[in-house]
């Protein structure tokens, strides 16, 4: 049987000779097993976006064969132990450059859900909490590698402004009833006044070179502990009382959350290289407004560390 050699249209010249930054596929789902030395492995089903650049002289990237190559690349990478999701992205990007000789760089993005076990604060009930995690890798032919790891966490915030108004009102009311000022102050210190709450959404992303190792669980911990209170999937009444009381004892503006995350990040990762790029973002979903509150800080780690140290010790 004689086979007809079909033309490779994608390898021809395009009508408009313009290079493309990214060509590839998105929403590719794969199962990933994260190996842990002292614990059971974690199973993720993340979504990948996978790209290579396309030179101006090439019409297309042979997407049908490209997808086949990407799928094979992922399968080969996933057959090996995976310890960090960002390193998996780096490995896939390297393999893509081996497959696509015309590309000068490859990029792999990943997002998924990460499950962690957690206990309620007072009764110790165990439950599973879900966190959004992110990883990204860019590999340039010739050896330049940049990778990103990050997480998004939902927790609780309490508004300081409305609380101060409630506190002032309570003080005047109790004083009018004849309660001594020192007794009022002691009461208000122990029983924080009501305020409106927000569901806070905090995000930290750390971009660095290939030799840097950052724990995703440490990032999650930083975000959770930078708001007024953590959230829990399962709470009994004693837990609920504790969470509400704790949040109102620790009121925070959206700006406070970002600044606290920055401080905790510098404290947790003091050995990060100065050229690591840090993105910290907080969105507070308002309960008494139709809008949301937003704050962000982007800086190199060196810039952030210098600014933090100018305020005094952070360790």
From Swiss-Prot:
InterPro entries referenced in this protein's UniProt entry, alphabetically: GTP_cyclohydrolase_FolE2/MptA, GTP_cyclohydrolase_MptA
Catalytic activity from the UniProt record: GTP + H2O = 7,8-dihydroneopterin 2',3'-cyclic phosphate + formate + diphosphate + H(+)
Site, May be catalytically important: residue positions: 159
Enzyme Commission (EC) number: 3.5.4.39
A Pfam match: GCHY-1
Pathway: Cofactor biosynthesis; 5,6,7,8-tetrahydromethanopterin biosynthesis
Comment on bound cofactor: Binds 1 Fe(2+) ion per subunit.
Top-level taxonomic group: Archaea
Any one GO biological process: tetrahydromethanopterin biosynthetic process
Keywords: Hydrolase, Iron, Metal-binding
Homology family: Belongs to the GTP cyclohydrolase IV family.
Purpose: Converts GTP to 7,8-dihydro-D-neopterin 2',3'-cyclic phosphate, the first intermediate in the biosynthesis of coenzyme methanopterin.
NCBIfam families (UniProt xref): GTP cyclohydrolase MptA
Subunit structure comment from the entry: Homodimer.
Protein name: GTP cyclohydrolase MptA 1
Organism, as annotated: Methanocella arvoryzae (strain DSM 22066 / NBRC 105507 / MRE50)
């Amino acid at each position: 049987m004689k086979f007809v050699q079909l033309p490779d249209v994608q390898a021809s010249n395009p009508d408009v000779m313009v290079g493309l930054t990214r060509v590839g596929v998105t929403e590719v789902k794969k199962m990933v097993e994260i190996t842990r030395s002292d614990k059971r492995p974690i199973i993720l089903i993340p979504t990948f976006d996978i790209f290579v650049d396309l030179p101006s002289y090439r019409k297309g990237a042979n997407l049908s064969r490209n997808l086949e190559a990407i799928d094979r690349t992922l399968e080969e990478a996933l057959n090996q132990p995976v310890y960090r999701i960002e390193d998996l992205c780096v490995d896939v990007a390297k393999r893509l450059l081996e497959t696509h000789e015309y590309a000068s760089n490859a990029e792999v993005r990943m997002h998924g859900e990460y499950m962690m076990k957690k206990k309620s604060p007072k009764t110790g009930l165990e439950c599973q909490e879900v966190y959004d995690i992110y990883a990204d890798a860019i590999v340039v032919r010739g050896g330049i590698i940049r990778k990103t790891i990050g997480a998004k966490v939902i927790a609780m915030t309490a508004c300081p402004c409305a609380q101060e108004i409630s506190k002032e009102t309570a003080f005047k009311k109790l004083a009018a009833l004849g309660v001594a000022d020192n007794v009022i102050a002691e009461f208000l210190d122990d029983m924080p006044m009501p305020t409106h709450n927000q569901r806070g959404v905090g995000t930290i992303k750390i971009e660095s070179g290939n030799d840097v190792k950052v724990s995703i669980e440490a990032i999650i911990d930083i975000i959770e502990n930078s708001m007024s209170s953590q959230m829990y999937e399962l709470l009994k009444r004693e837990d609920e009382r504790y969470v509400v009381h704790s949040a109102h004892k620790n009121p925070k503006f959206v700006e406070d959350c970002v600044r606290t995350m920055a401080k905790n990040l510098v404290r947790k990762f003091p050995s990060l290289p100065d050229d690591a790029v840090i993105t910290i973002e907080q969105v507070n979903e308002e309960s008494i407004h139709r809008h949301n509150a937003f704050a962000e800080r982007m800086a190199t780690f060196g810039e952030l560390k210098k600014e933090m140290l100018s305020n005094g010790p952070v360790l």
